[in-house]
Design a protein with these regions (language model features):
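Short, solvent-exposed secondary-structure boundary motifs
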Residues: 35-37, 41-48, 73-79, 103-110
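N-terminal glycine/threonine-rich, aromatic-flanked beta-hairpin/loop signature
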Residues: 49-100
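Bacterial N-terminal signal peptides that target proteins for export
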Residues: 1-9
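Tryptophan-anchored aromatic micro-motifs
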Residues: 28-53, 85-87
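Beta-sheet ligand-binding and adhesion/scaffold domains
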Residues: 24-33, 52, 63, 92-147
Length: 147
């Protein structure tokens, strides 16, 4: 078989195989720069795009009402309840881990992913990537009304 014809047959097959594997990149984080925050900066009510809220209290507890969370590859997951939260940071960004007192019925025994802190202008954000990274699920983004 001539080389040109063999190449013409191989290229479409390779293209199909690559597209079947999904995206080459994951969804980018929301707009904003990573920021390190003090625990006192986090103690407020954070709101997601659908009106869900996460109220972080100074004593390390929280109250959530239908707030978006990222758990494994589940998408569009909202969680209500109470629990505890912890603050952590690396060299450039703070993170908030939440632990609910009761399991979500869809994800028994799994913990939500940590939220990362961002700042866009004067707006503070907490965010987590949602769902399968090969799909275009929107990120879970919480904003602070105090910002």
């Amino acid at each position: 078989m001539p080389r040109r014809r063999r190449t013409a047959l191989i290229l479409p097959v390779m293209a199909l195989a690559l597209t079947a594997c999904g995206r080459f990149t994951v969804m980018p984080p929301p707009e904003g720069e990573p920021i390190r925050l003090k625990p006192a900066d986090l103690t407020t009510t954070w709101t997601d795009a659908d009106g869900g809220t996460l109220t972080l209290k100074q004593d390390g507890t929280f109250v959530a009402h239908q707030v978006c969370v990222a758990v494994a590859w589940y998408d569009s997951l909202a969680w209500s309840g109470t629990g505890t939260w912890e603050h952590g940071s690396n060299k450039k960004q703070s993170f908030v881990d939440v632990t609910f007192d009761a399991d979500h019925p869809e994800v028994r025994g799994r913990m939500p992913d940590a939220y990362g802190a961002l700042k866009q202008g004067e707006v503070l954000k907490l965010w987590a990537a949602v769902g399968d990274p090969d799909n275009d699920y929107p990120n879970c983004v919480l904003t602070s009304p105090a910002s």
